[in-house]
Amino acid sequence: MNKMKRIDFENGSVTGNILGATLPMLVAQILNLLYNIVDRVYIARIPKVGTTALGAVGLCFPIIVIITAFSNLFGSGGAPLFSIYRGKKQENTAVQIMDTSFSMLCICGVFLMLIGFLFARPILVVFGASSNALTYAYPYIMIYLIGTLPSMISIGMNPFINAQGYSTIGMLSVAIGAVANLLLDPLFIFVLGFGVQGAAIATILSQTLSAAFVLFFLTRKSELRVRLLRKNEVPQCTGYAKDIVSLGSAGFIMQLTNSLVTICCNNVLSVTGGNIYISVMTIISSIRQLVETPLHAINEGASPILSYNYGACRPKHVRKAGAILSVMVLVYTAVTWSMIILIPEFLIRIFSSDTVLLKDAVIALKQYFAAFIFMDLQYIGQTVFKSLNKKKFAIFFSLLRKVFIVVPLTYLMPYALHMGTKGVFLAEPVSNVIGGSICFVTMLCTVLPELKKMEK
């Protein structure tokens, strides 16, 4: 397997490398989306209780996002450093970084699972769950928590497969779990009659299969192989751990703040619009995941190319990779935004056929995505900052848009400006324009001068 076709970061063209990494990544991200989307589609179609159950499971999303955020803290934090040191030809250091990421990920996975078991019910109540919603949300999340460690391994270690150029293997690791989930969901939900709990069972079994494949490849077949740190290695890897957490904090904060925004939105919507609007928000969040999936693929595909060439001191390659990244992201978003505005009913019906829900969701969806194209600027800036190890900028802009703009607006617009539910959905486009523009301009003003100096 070491002789299989890989992306040649050293000699391949920048455009070819980005496309070679992005296309398998796109397939992987689309398949990965099935883990959550398929659950929601099937749950929404459970007879009599589908809409209620969908809203209840939506209350679990912040917990799931938190688990994913910790996975990416170590995976997305470690993989760019891993690529930078590979670019510098310091492979022993690269392996130590990968081992450190893996060890921290495993410890964190067990810890999060135990915390979840102890506090899941009060957490769901804080997130806005009514006694009726808890009937569906609590069993779902308790089962999901059993698969915390496999979920974190499959998500957190996959970037190290892609960072070694095995983009097809990275895609396959996701495909295994996604296809299994697609097959197991109807079996456990409808055939065996487990309902919402069946969706959770199908998900954790699928994630376990994916994690097993990732571990098999990274421990047996990849060029640089992973293992847990030995006790005597821990002191010398403390510095790497700090760097990993520091760099991974940007993506970690973005995902945690996504949960924070979801919690705030659900709390305000429960007061201003009731349970029906929590279901609307669940559908909008699902559509956002759907349309953002290719964006994540493009960003994650370009990231190792940016990191490797930055580590190898090739400023022209870094600049070209950034330009290609920007064009791909902008073109994709222009097409997607047009679809959202022109055919919102089609996208909403993927998740629910409830006519009452559809009427409210169409209006809310258009409001929420009104300035979605400005979100590109945030994605491009964040990807460049993370890939080039610009920790402070990456962390700052992760906080700026969500914590300092969206959250205050989520309360200010519905209450102080008396906009009701409309204010909740319009807080997003306002933050996209402000936060995205500032992030992109800052990236241009800081990174381009550094690359010019590197050329000299």
Regions of interest found by a model, annotated:
Residues 54-114, 151-170, 266, 278-338, ...:
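Small-residue-rich hydrophobic transmembrane alpha-helices
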Residues 72-75, 144-162, 170-181, 199-214, ...:
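Short runs within selected transmembrane alpha-helices of multi-pass transporters and secretion channels
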Residues 9-49, 62-77, 81, 106-113, ...:
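N-terminal transmembrane alpha-helices
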